[in-house]
């Protein structure tokens, strides 16, 4: 299963300006906020979670919330996903791959899910 999402970084900037850090907690946890220092990274994390929801096929819904998947970076700075056990079980997920990129004022993310 593949999911892709793209977002204008300015959209995140505008929402952060309007709502402050309260906005960030709608889709990120404290650790993710500490990792995502720039608005481009925040936008990439948002796109990644949307892409994950699309790969699941259910979108953001009662079956899947933004907080059911977390994004971290490895020692090389590459993003990876930590998926809640209930999501792994409910959707038979064996493995997940994530790629995030930023260019031209946009952030894009692609998620590939491998099912059991």
Predicted regions and their residues:
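Core catalytic alpha/beta fold that binds nucleotide/phospho-ligands
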Residues: 1-116
């Amino acid at each position: 299963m593949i999911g892709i999402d793209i977002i204008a970084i300015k959209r995140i900037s505008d929402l952060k300006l309007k709502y402050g850090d309260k906005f960030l907690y709608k889709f990120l946890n404290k650790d993710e906020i500490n990792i995502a220092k720039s608005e481009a990274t925040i936008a990439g994390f948002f796109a990644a979670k949307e892409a994950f929801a699309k790969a699941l096929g259910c979108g953001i819904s009662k079956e899947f919330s933004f907080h059911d998947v977390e994004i971290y970076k490895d020692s090389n700075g590459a993003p990876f996903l930590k998926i809640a056990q209930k999501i792994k079980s409910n959707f038979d997920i064996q493995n997940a791959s994530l790629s995030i990129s930023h260019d031209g004022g946009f952030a894009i993310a692609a998620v590939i899910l491998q099912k059991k």
